[in-house]
């Protein structure tokens, strides 16, 4: 289908899911995007705050889910749909949208399409009908794994994502198992680690703490030149993520130490190597567009999805112009 743009030249999109993530994404599009225009907000609870806020902001809404979206007059002009529902609901949403030629950006752990982490592999998947934004923990940590792997192979990577309990809505809590499985898989497929593991911690502390992530990478070289190159690569990657998530930062300097002889992780390193452990501590503060600043886990997810949506829209518009 031809790219549908508004009178301002923006590509029209819809958001399915009127919870925390969907609502924050809607507001980001409204306030910050020079490329996208939100044409519809979709939920299943007519009284949800997300739909109520959308109505106040003059965004067309439906509380009848995907079926309601397909019946909306605005649907004909929508080119890209962001799905912020759940892994279970996404399969049907994707089937119906793909059959109608819409591109889908999946913010659930369903992972029907390829995993996408913008600074690592977005451009490689711009032709995919469905792309998956992994998880909040994945968006925060996989760029670091990829940065280390760009210098020297990562034999094992483990990430620990600690988020404020208050920032985890019912969707996040219902998908905890999918979170760990999806993130671990993407650590390998996108980050490049030979083996990956993910752990999520819901921190009940009051007042709520911002998102904090720890990334451990086991590498097969501990010489100074490799260490210096790893630190430089990680620093560059942090700067790239900060382009679209300003609250993303290194909490401490990158730490690299030789793996001791009795370290159980040493057996995962290549035979004959002098393995080292790279440890990176991250902190993510949210932009507070809709959610509190401590909800950096949600902010990095919606910011990554927005980045992907804008890049996809630009690509579609360029191709349309080239064939006009």
Swiss-Prot record:
Keywords: Aromatic hydrocarbons catabolism, NAD, Oxidoreductase. GO terms for molecular function: acetaldehyde dehydrogenase (acetylating) activity; NAD binding. The keyword Oxidoreductase applies. GO terms for biological process: catabolic process. InterPro entries: Acetaldehyde_dehydrogenase (IPR003361), Acetylaldehyde_DH_C (IPR015426), NAD(P)-bd_dom_sf (IPR036291), Semialdehyde_DH_NAD-bd (IPR000534). HAMAP family: Ac_ald_DH_ac (MF_01657). This is Acetaldehyde dehydrogenase 1. It comes from Parafrankia sp. (strain EAN1pec).
